[in-house]
């Protein structure tokens, strides 16, 4: 009974967290949820070999529904990924080969799996791939059975497409224009196969979702619903989920757990409590209490550490979180003895600036090559002023030449200038 109670309030709970951008027929959906568990889906197109932070809110939304007793379907678009969604994109997407897309499908399925429970009885999650129904469909079937239900007049008036059509330098190909039909049919297909009654997605998907609702009604005479989550923005107007190095990925080989943890630690005070509502499963009351505590403590806020810990654990597990915190602590304290070889690999991947050097190099040259100083002369002064450490140990001899003891695990040396400027030397 508790599950159903939570479920009937689910839309309200999501709204309290700021997680609802648009919803079709909210009262009817709330009533449907109150009657008992439903199946719902969210689609993830393989446009790269990993999901990124932008995918996390809808993915966690699937998890929220499952926790309330509903059955989530994670659809990876093996077919739609071959076409490319034009929604609010300034230019035509590059088409990827079928082999590449199928490889990416496998990786993304694996990435989605830990967030959902695929073995919990009646509301066990399902993984689906729309290539299963589009792969063998011929063009005549597509045009007759799907195309005849779509009005071109309505399609070109959808905001996502209209923006492209209004650009003089960019039109839209028939390939991308037809994407709306494919995603619409996904909904109708999942409704028939698994009784899916709700699609969730980012607010840029509204046009595709409403097409699917309309098509499902026409093909199966079933009422289904759509709900979108907001696209995440930052208070300062800059794009969320990007760093100087590009997107923040969920794949630890593309964004290390340390870098991922640091991304959240650096969240602005103006964003952090909102992000706790979006990206964690903490109660609203708990988040509000934390905000109040931070406001009155007179110290640096604790919220960023709570956020970083919660989201890193969600995405990278306890092991990833422990490593990220260990690296953070060691860099802060300057004592590197607790770092493992795997920790150094994370730092080399994207944690701190990295430079490769030949054995026999001296400290002055290392500071220049690492861009910690502009010239050997400047490097000499900095070293002499006791402002440089090698693996956490001060070194004030400008003529210092690195030796084997400086090469941790035979390969790594961490330089620091001042308090915060790091560079990792990887010896060739």
Swiss-Prot record:
Output this protein's name. Answer: Tyrosine--tRNA ligase
Q: Self-association or partners: how does it assemble?
A: Homodimer.
Motif 'HIGH' region, residue range(s) on this chain: 46-55
- Which gene specifies this protein's sequence? tyrS
Classify the main location: cytoplasm
Example of a GO cellular component annotation carried by this entry: cytosol
- The superkingdom of the source organism is Bacteria
At which positions is L-tyrosine bound?
Answer: 41, 179, 183
Provide any one GO MF term from the record. ATP binding
Please state every residue range assigned to the domain named S4 RNA-binding. 361-418
Q: Which HAMAP family match?
A: Tyr_tRNA_synth_type1
Kindly indicate whether the keyword Chloroplast belongs to this entry. no
Positions annotated to bind ATP: 242
Q: What top-level class of enzyme does the UniProt entry assign?
A: ligase
User: What does the entry give for GO biological process?
Assistant: tyrosyl-tRNA aminoacylation
List the taxonomic lineage. Answer: Bacteria, Pseudomonadati, Pseudomonadota, Gammaproteobacteria, Enterobacterales
Q: What does this protein do?
A: Catalyzes the attachment of tyrosine to tRNA(Tyr) in a two-step reaction: tyrosine is first activated by ATP to form Tyr-AMP and then transferred to the acceptor end of tRNA(Tyr).
UniProt entry keywords in alphabetical sequence: Aminoacyl-tRNA synthetase, ATP-binding, Cytoplasm, Ligase, Nucleotide-binding, Protein biosynthesis, RNA-binding
EC numbers, comma separated: 6.1.1.1
Question: Which family is it part of?
Answer: Belongs to the class-I aminoacyl-tRNA synthetase family. TyrS type 1 subfamily.
Write out the annotated subcellular location: Cytoplasm
> Where is the short sequence motif 'KMSKS' region located?
239-243
Reactions listed under catalytic activity? tRNA(Tyr) + L-tyrosine + ATP = L-tyrosyl-tRNA(Tyr) + AMP + diphosphate + H(+)
């Amino acid at each position: 009974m508790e599950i159903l109670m939570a479920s009937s309030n689910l839309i309200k709970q999501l709204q309290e967290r700021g997680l609802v951008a648009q919803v079709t027929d909210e009262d009817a959906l709330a009533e449907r949820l109150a009657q008992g568990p439903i199946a719902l889906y969210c689609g993830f197109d393989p446009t790269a070999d990993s999901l990124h932070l932008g995918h996390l809110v809808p993915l966690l939304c699937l998890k929220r529904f499952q926790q309330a007793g509903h059955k989530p379907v994670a659809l990876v678009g093996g077919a739609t990924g071959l076409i490319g969604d034009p929604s609010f994109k300034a230019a035509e997407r590059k088409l990827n080969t079928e082999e590449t897309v199928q490889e990416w499908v496998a990786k993304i399925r694996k990435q989605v799996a830990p967030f959902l429970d695929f073995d919990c009885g009646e509301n066990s999650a399902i993984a689906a791939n729309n290539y299963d129904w589009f792969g063998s469909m011929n063009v005549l079937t597509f045009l007759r059975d799907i195309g005849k239900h779509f009005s071109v007049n309505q399609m070109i008036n959808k905001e996502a497409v209209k923006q492209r059509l209004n650009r003089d330098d960019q039109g839209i190909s028939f390939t991308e224009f037809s994407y709306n039909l494919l995603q619409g049919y996904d909904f109708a297909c999942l409704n028939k196969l698994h009784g899916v009654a709700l699609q969730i997605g980012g607010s840029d998907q509204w046009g595709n979702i409403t097409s699917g609702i309309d098509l499902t009604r026409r093909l199966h005479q079933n009422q289904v619903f759509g709900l979108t989550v907001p696209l995440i923005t930052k208070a300062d107007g800059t794009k969320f989920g990007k760093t100087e190095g590009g997107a923040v990925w969920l794949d630890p080989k593309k964004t290390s757990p340390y870098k991922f943890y640091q991304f959240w630690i650096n969240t602005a005070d103006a964003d952090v409590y909102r992000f706790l509502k979006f990206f964690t499963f903490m109660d609203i009351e708990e988040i509000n209490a934390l905000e109040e505590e931070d406001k009155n403590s007179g110290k640096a806020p604790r919220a960023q550490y709570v956020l970083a810990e919660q989201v890193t654990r969600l995405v990278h597990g306890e092991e990833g979180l422990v490593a990220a915190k260990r690296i953070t602590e060691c860099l802060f304290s300057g004592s590197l003895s607790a770092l493992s070889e795997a920790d150094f690999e994370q730092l080399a991947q994207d944690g701190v600036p990295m430079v490769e050097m030949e054995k026999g190099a001296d400290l002055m040259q290392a500071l220049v090559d690492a861009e910690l100083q502009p010239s050997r002369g400047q490097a000499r002064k900095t070293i002499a002023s006791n402002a440089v450490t090698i693996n956490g140990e001060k070194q004030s001899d400008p003529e210092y030449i690195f030796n084997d003891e400086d090469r941790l695990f035979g390969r790594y040396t961490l330089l620091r200038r001042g308090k915060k400027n790091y560079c990792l030397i990887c010896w060739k």
